Swiss-Prot record:
Zn(2+) 2 binds at residues 145, 179, 216, 261. NCBIfam families: nfo (TIGR00587), PRK01060.1-4 (NF002199). GO terms for biological process: base-excision repair. It comes from the Bacteria. Zn(2+) 3 binds at residues 182, 229, 231. This is Probable endonuclease 4. The keyword Cell wall biogenesis/degradation does not apply. Its cofactor is Zn(2+).
């Protein structure tokens, strides 16, 4: 069995996330805990929480299969102390909501220096923000997503991820989500089997495969090392199905959520079926 699904819409309520995932035949799913483009601190009603937990049990989804995504507005490395505090508070709010929903993972983007501080300074601020969040919450693993290196985003290389983890105090509550499109766009070679082997060997050597807690399985509309984050459906971009096949067969050595964020959601069911056939 594989934990494979998609990032589905929560429009209409959190319960719809589960229904939509079940309709896809998914054994994993991702969703936004709240509107990803608003700063609102969300407090779920008790009935919403109870219904979500009930439906997860009814349809046999456990927390290891669910990889919720944090708000796009959160920047844990923000150069402004005022905006950094705002990001930290929203991040903690999302972690608390994960715990209330019986979820054990939260996927997030590390942050951006906005060309106002150095990458190293930004990495330190991200690690400090993670430590702040861990100190003020319990029970949820924080899963850092690698980035494409677009704009001033950090986290586009394994060295960045390793530096952040090195400064995190509760290492049992930190993990990594590798996005295949982001790997490709940031310069890692996923086009050939040899390239895939070398890329994941480098990840193991620099970060450690034991930190891998999820993956986003996407093709890319842009060429390798473009530093442009544009997802594509599997086999329709510059990565190709053969590389995705190798990753699915060789990297998912332990069960963790593999989430599609491909552009045409009408193809999700077929993509899930294809991955499950491997």
């Amino acid at each position: 069995m594989k934990y494979i699904g998609a990032h589905v819409s929560a429009a209409g309520g959190l319960d719809q996330v589960i229904f939509r995932s079940k309709e896809l035949g998914a054994t994993a799913f991702s969703f936004f805990l709240s509107n990803p483009l608003r700063w609102n601190l969300i407090q779920f009603r008790d009935e919403t929480i109870k219904k979500f937990i009930f439906l997860c049990k009814k349809f046999n989804y456990v927390s290891d299969q669910i990889l919720p995504h944090s708000s796009y507005l959160i920047n844990l490395g923000h150069p402004s102390d005022e905006h950094l505090k705002k990001s930290r508070l929203l991040f903690v709010n999302e972690i608390i909501n994960c715990k209330k929903l019986n979820l054990s993972l939260l996927n997030f983007h590390p942050g951006s220096h906005l060309r106002k501080i150095s990458e190293q300074h930004c990495l330190i601020r991200v690690a400090d923000s993670i430590n702040f969040a861990l100190q003020n919450t319990v029970g949820v693993k924080l899963v850092i997503e690698n980035t494409a290196g677009q704009g001033s985003n950090i986290g586009y290389c394994f060295e960045h991820l390793a530096q952040i983890i090195h400064k995190v105090k509760e290492k049992d509550r930190i993990g990594i989500c590798l996005d295949t499109c982001h790997l490709h766009a940031s310069g890692y070679d996923l086009k050939t089997e040899l390239g895939c082997r070398q890329t994941f060997k480098a990840f193991n050597d620099i970060v450690g495969l034991h930190y891998l807690s999820g993956m986003h399985i996407n093709d890319s509309k842009t060429k390798r090392n473009s530093r442009i984050d544009r997802h594509h459906n599997l086999g329709q971009g510059y990565i190709g199905k053969s590389s995705i096949r190798w990753i699915i067969r060789n990297i998912n050595f332990k069960l963790f959520p593999m989430i599609l964020e491909t552009t045409n959601n009408k193809l999700w069911k077929d993509e899930i079926n294809w991955i499950n056939s491997l």
